Curated annotation (Swiss-Prot):
Family, similarity comment: Belongs to the IL-6 superfamily.
Protein name as it appears in the record: Cardiotrophin-1
Superkingdom of this protein's organism: Eukaryota
Keywords: Cytokine, Secreted
GO biological process entries: cell surface receptor signaling pathway via JAK-STAT; cell-cell signaling; muscle organ development; nervous system development; neuron development; neuron differentiation; positive regulation of cell population proliferation; positive regulation of tyrosine phosphorylation of STAT protein
Organism: Homo sapiens
Amino acid sequence: MSRREGSLEDPQTDSSVSLLPHLEAKIRQTHSLAHLLTKYAEQLLQEYVQLQGDPFGLPSFSPPRLPVAGLSAPAPSHAGLPVHERLRLDAAALAALPPLLDAVCRRQAELNPRAPRLLRRLEDAARQARALGAAVEALLAALGAANRGPRAEPPAATASAASATGVFPAKVLGLRVCGLYREWLSRTEGDLGQLLPGGSA
């Protein structure tokens, strides 16, 4: 009987021993995904600018930083927060981005119907933001630092992206959303890097 009980305990022991390597592998995988998507986000932003016409892309052009409901750029104080809190903010931003990117894609389909690659990039970006956000949330759960309670839906995110009237404001708002997408992916990549061996979490 005692032998049987001992055999039942062995898998638990093995599981506890392998937890750390498994968690490290999960962190590396999520960090690699964030790194790859950051590169894609840079390509998306460059292609978006190229297809909007003048004055977009001109060195002298400084577009207004339109506010986007439900999403802002990473705050200057972000880097000083504990890494788990930073990752919670990253996950929230990644959850807010897909409806914004979807709305920009729909607007660009009207403004640039002959730019299928840009539209495909925007569609992919929305899916990729969802995937990375889910991966970050799963990692937080594995670390025992998941958000408590149901996640709040992004407030009026889609309405914000779709509400710009006129061609120029719509293009500027799309540029802002693509820029925020790149900023938050880069920030997420950096925050995940703090959890890797050699990081300063």
